[in-house]
């Protein structure tokens, strides 16, 4: 197996196969769930809006893949600093049956100098998730934070507040996951000594098998080749799947999606 094939198989099994579009429908979510079951293995999860969780659960069970996890998003994509709303949305997502919640950190508040609201928001959502055995991923929106110091600070705050994963991006802003921001965030995980309990998720802009290989190489460099399993690493993507399958000898590499 070539290096690209090996990394592509790894990446496929780490994917949160995603559709977060305004025109999402039950039919599109059903199709996404079907795509998550591939000839070479299943993706780690699907990531969808909360209202589609019941139809996704039904579809995943019916196709014999109940182990594919269901992730959803809250405080999304705006990352406002209203803790009550973020918490209410997170509780609603849990009530819908989410296995994982990806909440957007109040990044604009941090840019304006407010570190406390981000900590409190993540902490509140973590308490709700922990009570229901739901994983919490925190989206810090690196492409808007821009500066290394802010990316580092948002990562640190999220981890201190209880994040199970730190995630680069919503996929809804001009700049999403980059190798540079990925390295900064994983270095924070390393520097804080939390690599056993905190994972990393690049999202948006990871579109090709070669992209995925590059992102995995950073994780392998920092933590060794065994770290990036589905408890410690995910890719938030949709168009990536077709490229990975093509690298693995399945399909033509074409995808209808841009995430």
Swiss-Prot record:
Report the active site residues. 102 (proton donor/acceptor), 167 (schiff-base intermediate with acetaldehyde), 201 (proton donor/acceptor)
Q: Which GO terms describe its biological process?
A: 2-deoxyribose 1-phosphate catabolic process; carbohydrate catabolic process; deoxyribonucleotide catabolic process
Which UniProt keywords are listed?
Cytoplasm, Lyase, Schiff base
Provide the catalytic activity annotation.
2-deoxy-D-ribose 5-phosphate = D-glyceraldehyde 3-phosphate + acetaldehyde
Q: Which GO terms describe its molecular function?
A: deoxyribose-phosphate aldolase activity
Pathway in which this enzyme or protein is active: Carbohydrate degradation; 2-deoxy-D-ribose 1-phosphate degradation; D-glyceraldehyde 3-phosphate and acetaldehyde from 2-deoxy-alpha-D-ribose 1-phosphate: step 2/2
Report the principal subcellular site: cytoplasm
Q: Which InterPro entries match?
A: Aldolase_TIM, DeoC, DeoC/FbaB/LacD_aldolase, DeoC_typeII
NCBIfam families reported for this sequence: deoC (TIGR00126)
- What biological function has been recorded for the protein in this entry? Catalyzes a reversible aldol reaction between acetaldehyde and D-glyceraldehyde 3-phosphate to generate 2-deoxy-D-ribose 5-phosphate.
How is this protein named in the record? Deoxyribose-phosphate aldolase
Q: What species is this protein from?
A: Klebsiella pneumoniae (strain 342)
């Amino acid at each position: 197996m070539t290096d690209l094939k090996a990394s592509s198989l790894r990446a496929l099994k780490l994917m949160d196969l995603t559709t977060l579009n305004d025109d999402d429908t039950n039919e599109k979510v059903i199709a996404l769930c079907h795509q998550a079951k591939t000839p070479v293995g299943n993706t780690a999860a699907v990531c969808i809006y909360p209202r589609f969780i019941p139809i996704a659960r039904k579809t995943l069970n019916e196709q014999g893949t109940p182990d594919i996890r269901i992730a959803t998003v809250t405080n999304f994509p705006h990352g406002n600093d209203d803790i009550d709303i973020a918490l209410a949305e997170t509780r609603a997502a849990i009530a819908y049956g989410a296995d994982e919640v990806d909440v957007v950190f109040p990044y604009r508040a941090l840019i304006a100098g407010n570190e406390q609201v981000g900590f409190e928001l993540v902490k509140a959502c973590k308490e709700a998730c922990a009570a229901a055995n739901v994983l919490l991923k925190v989206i810090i929106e690196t492409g808007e934070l821009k500066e290394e110091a802010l990316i580092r600070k948002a990562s640190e705050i999220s981890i201190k507040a209880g994040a199970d994963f730190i995630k680069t991006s919503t996929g809804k802003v001009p700049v999403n996951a980059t190798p540079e921001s990925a390295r900064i965030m994983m270095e924070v995980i390393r520097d804080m000594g939390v690599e056993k309990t905190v994972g990393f998720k690049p999202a948006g802009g990871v579109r090709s098998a070669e992209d995925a290989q590059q992102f995995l190489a950073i994780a392998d460099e920092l933590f060794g080749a065994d770290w990036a399993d589905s408890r410690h690493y995910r890719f938030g993507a949709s168009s990536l799947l077709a490229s990975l399958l093509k690298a693995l000898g399945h399909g033509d590499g074409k995808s209808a999606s841009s995430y």
